[in-house]
Every structure is written in C-alpha cells, then in structure tokens.
Amino acid sequence: MFKLFTARQHDKIWDFDGGIHPPEMKLQSSTVPMRIAPLPDQLIIPLQQHLGPEGELRVRAGEQVLKGQPLTVGRGRTVPVHAPTSGMITAIAPHTTAHPSGLAELCVHITPDGEDRWREQQPWADYRQRDKMALLDRIHQAGIAGLGGAGFPTASKLQGGLNGIITLIINAAECEPYITADDRLMQEHADEVITGIHILRHLLQPQQVLIGIEDNKPEAIAALQRALRGQDDIHLRVVPTKYPSGGAKQLTKILTGKEVPFGKHSSSIGVLMQNVGTVVAIKRAVIDDEPLIERVVTLTGDALSSPGNFWARIGTPVLYLLKLAGFKPQNPPMVIMGGPLMGFTLPSLDVPIVKISNCILAPAETEMGLSEPEQSCIRCGLCVDACPAGLLPQQLYWFSRGEEHEKARNHNLFDCIECGACAYVCPSNIPLVQYYRQEKAEIRALDQESARAAEAKARFEAKQARLAREKLARELRHKQAAVKLTDADQQTVDAAVSRLTRQSDGSESVINIPAGQMPDNSAVIAAREARKAQARARQAEKQQARSTEETTDVVDPRQAAVAAAIARVKAKKAVQAQHVTTDVAEAGSEAMAEDPRKAAVAAAIARVKAKKAAQAQHVTTDVAEAGSEAMAEDPRKAAVAAAIARVKAKKAAQAINPD
C-alpha cells in the first residue's frame, strides 16, 4: 500500500493560478513532416542572437569561410555565431533584424558557394570520457543559446547549475497556439532528444529528470515513450493543455508543486529547465561537433498554401521561407515572428531567422480579426484572474502609463513573462503587454544611467582620494626638507659635538687665565659693535624710506602751488629780516661809535623792527596754514586765502620797510 501511495505521489501533477484556453490552431502544421529549406542566395547573420553582448569579429569582408566556422569570439556570456554554409563574406554591415523596434544591427553577409563544405570536425563518440569543463566549453563554443525564446547562453546556465540541482526539467509543453516546431522535432528526432537528456544528466547529476509535455501532442508522446524504452531514470509527465503551461515558473509548479519566489529563478529552488530544441542542439554539438547553424521553424497561417515545419539555416531571410510555404500577401500585410500571443509584427520581410526564431505566422485578413480601438479600463479584474504569475496587471498598467517606475518595480513588473493572457481577456482591448515591455525598457535605461552615474561618482571620489594622498605626501616631503640641515649647519653641529667629545675625554685642554689678567674679548666686542652699526644703518634706512613715502604722496597741483608760494614768501621775509637786522646793527654800530645815546636809541629802534618782522613772519605762517586747510576743503577758498595771505605779507613788508 505504501509503495502504491509513493508511486501516486511520484506521478502527481499540480496546477498554477490563472491561465487561459485559446484556440490551439496547431493541426495546420503538426501533421506535416518537416522539410529542409534550400540555401538562399544570401545569408544574413546578426552578431548578437542571445541574451548578452555581441562577440568580437574573427573574419573580414572578402574572406572565404567554411560551414560551421566561427565568425565571432565566444568568451564568458558572449556566445559565438558560425557560418551556416561555405561561401564568401560579401559585407559586414548593419541590417534590420527580428526585433519589435525594427532597428538595424551589425550582421555578416555571406553569399553561399553551393558546395556546403564543412570545416574540420572532431566528433566525440563517448562524451562520458570527457570532464565537465570540457563538455561545457564544447557547448559554449558551439554557440548554443536557449531555443525556447529567451536566448540565455546555455553553457552559462549549465555551469551555474553544476551544484545544487535536484530536478532537471525538459520543457516540451509548447503551449502557444500555432507553434509546432518542438512537436515535430520530438516526433521525428526523439532519439536525439533522449541522448541530449543523458548528456545533461551526466553533467548536472540531478536526483530526477522530468519531461513535461501537454496532452495535445499524442504523436510526440508516443515517440518519446518508444525512445525511452522503459528507462526509469527519465520520467515523462503528460500535463493538461493550458496556456501558458510552458512558462518556466508555471511548468515548475505543475511538475514539482514548488513555486519560484518573486524576483528569483527556478535554480533558487534546485530546478533547472531546458527546451527540447536546446537539448537536440546540445547532442549535436557534443557528439557530432556541429555548432548551432540551423533550427526548426514553424511556417503557418491561412496566408500560406503549404504550412509546415522547416529546417532553416540561421540567417535565412523570412521572405525566402514564406515563399517556400506558398505565401499569399494580404492587405494590409501582416507577418508575425512568434505566436499570436507573445510574438510581434515584423517591420520588414527581409529580416533573417535567428537562433530564437521558432515560428513565422502569416495570418489571413479574417483569421486574426479586426483590431478594435483601445478603450478605457473598466476595472473588471479579468486580467488579474488570467495572470499566471500572480501579478496585478491593472495596477501595472496604471503605473506604466503614469511612469511611476518604482511602484511598477515594487509590484514585481519584471516577474511578468509577457504571455499576453491579460491582453487576451481584456474587454477594453488594451495592449497591456506593450505597456509592460515599454515600462521594462524605460526602467532598464534608468538603471543603466544610474549605474553610469555611480561609476562616475566612484571614479571622482577615487581621484579626490588620490589627490589628497598626493597632497599629504608633498606636505610630508616639504616638512622633511625643512628640518633637514644644510651642509654648513651640519658641519657646525659636527664641530661642536667634536669639541664636546674632546673636552669630555680630556683630549682638548681648557684655557686657563692667570689671576690678575683680563681675557681678550676684543673679537666679541668688535662683533657687538658691528651688529650695533648694522642696526643703526637699518633704522636709518627705515626712516629714510618713511620720509620718501611721505614726500612721494600724491599732492593736489593747487595745494603744491600754494605751498611753493608760501615757501618763497618765507624765504623773502627771512632775507629782508636779516637785511634789516644787519642794517640796524650797522647803523647802531656807527651811531654808537659817534654818540652813546644815539647808539642806544638806534638799538631800541632795531629791537622794535625785529619784533615787528617776527610778528609779520608769524602772521604769514598762520595765513599759509589757514590757506592750506581751506584748500583742502575747497580749491576756491584756497585761492582766496592765498591772495589774502599775499596782501597781508605785502602790508607787513611795507610796515617793516616804509621806504
């Protein structure tokens, strides 16, 4: 009984919230055997066909290449691309690629030579004899990226799962309408699928391996069961048809019952998932040494007369494949890359097939229905019920329209798998997925700008820290240079130390002065006198400099003229006074010689005249000073004062010398 219960638990499947059941539309192509597309006239190989940076070119225009030859270098998360066939590289130039933006990307243009010659190949008959790192390098150099649509580098994904992987899940659900590439691949190449699973099992050593496939693929289920041949280490799980059961988180929940936390990947709970097409590419790379140069592409839609699945070389133009399937252009023309829910309308039909191109849908005019205009949200909540990721599409829509980036991020916008279930059920015809894609792109752009700003800030701070260190080092060197003694000072110090040493050990005798004698201090006295003389000379120079500064001050021309006039008057009065005094003295001497009384009278007269002359000179000086003050206040007053001074001086002179 316990074994029966354990077996039932082992085969149990779970369900996920949300999801929809759109028309499948798979019978158009799933019942038709795969065909091999012939080589086109030109192949266009974009350098970036995966999630990550493009590789560095290894070829140049005009070079001849062989089938499988690498065109770019593969390092880290850079996945190389290879020549799909042999031929000539005619150009390396931008070209429109399969992207909703319609932007041009750098591509290698190859003109096939028709020979389809391979480069030298080195198959590995027994991969078990190779170590894990050699296997990972082989997968990486083969240019394998996730063929389910994400395009994540497979080798990087496997390397991250070398430790701690409990469950390996092979995604064979292929849940989106119209697409049957994996279905036909399993029907026709089931043995290669199982061999690829064994390679992954050898690499990862998981506890269990599960294949998840929807119940609407009975032929593929039967083919896998035949290929397994009763193997009990790989379990085939058939799950109900429900969109989007092929999502990574949704299929993990269905097969294990575990939910991947928000913001995490399935590897965080010990689960690693690979697509069926990726598994076949791994088998061919490891065992056959064939890089990823072709894939299965579904061509379907009512605008095609012979839909089906084709093995198409990477770089084949879409229009070339459509013509192989009997394309009938519609009005208006519409060709979708991918499915009707997650795909996008191609901007041009000359875009090339890339590694993640699984379907080309060419619907008829009536097949997709008329596109109705977008209307306002009525808050019905149907989008919330349909969301398989457990998000709030209505809130994310408002945040996206209002450019509230942080709120959109906090409401787990990046957990949206863009399945289109919300837009499918919306009665207002709101293209919700388009809003979410645009909001994600804007947030990524802002994050990149913030990262660049943080990097610039870090560089600036590092520069400032370096400049501060250099400044401290310079200051330290300057301090060390300042305290370093010159050669002369060092010699003086050394001589003093030497004298002290000689005195201490008695090698140099002390000078003794006999009693009653004075020491010879003449040299000291002479040095002191010399210093005093130098001090006096410096003091005299300072005084002379101050006088020069005083005399060289800027003087007003009128004030200078007044001062010069006053100086002349003073000099004239002094001469006249001296002349008067001399005359009086001479007269007095003569009179004294003749008569003593007359001499006394003459002397008295001379004293009176001298006193008046002195008073007149004092008055002139006062007037001049007053004139100077007035001139400082007003030039006109100064001129008047000078005139008055001259008049007074003239009167004084007349009083002194009436003759």
Swiss-Prot record:
[4Fe-4S] cluster 1 binds at residues 377, 380, 383, 426. Its main location: membrane. Residues 366-397, 407-436 form the 4Fe-4S ferredoxin-type domain. It comes from the Bacteria. Its cofactor is [4Fe-4S] cluster. Keywords: 4Fe-4S, Cell inner membrane, Cell membrane, Electron transport, Iron, Iron-sulfur, Membrane, Metal-binding, Repeat, Translocase, Transport. SUPFAM superfamilies: alpha-helical ferredoxin, Nqo1 FMN-binding domain-like. Binds 2 [4Fe-4S] clusters per subunit. [4Fe-4S] cluster 2 binds at residues 387, 416, 419, 422. GO terms for cellular component: plasma membrane. Transmembrane segments: none annotated. One of its GO terms (biological process) is electron transport chain. GO terms for molecular function: 4 iron, 4 sulfur cluster binding; electron transfer activity; metal ion binding. The keyword Transcription does not apply. It is found in: Cell inner membrane. It is an enzyme of class 7 (translocase). Its EC number is 7.-.-.-. It is a peripheral membrane protein. Disulfide bonds: none annotated. The complex is composed of six subunits: RnfA, RnfB, RnfC, RnfD, RnfE and RnfG. Part of a membrane-bound complex that couples electron transfer with translocation of ions across the membrane. HAMAP family: RsxC_RnfC. Belongs to the 4Fe4S bacterial-type ferredoxin family. RnfC subfamily. This is Ion-translocating oxidoreductase complex subunit C.
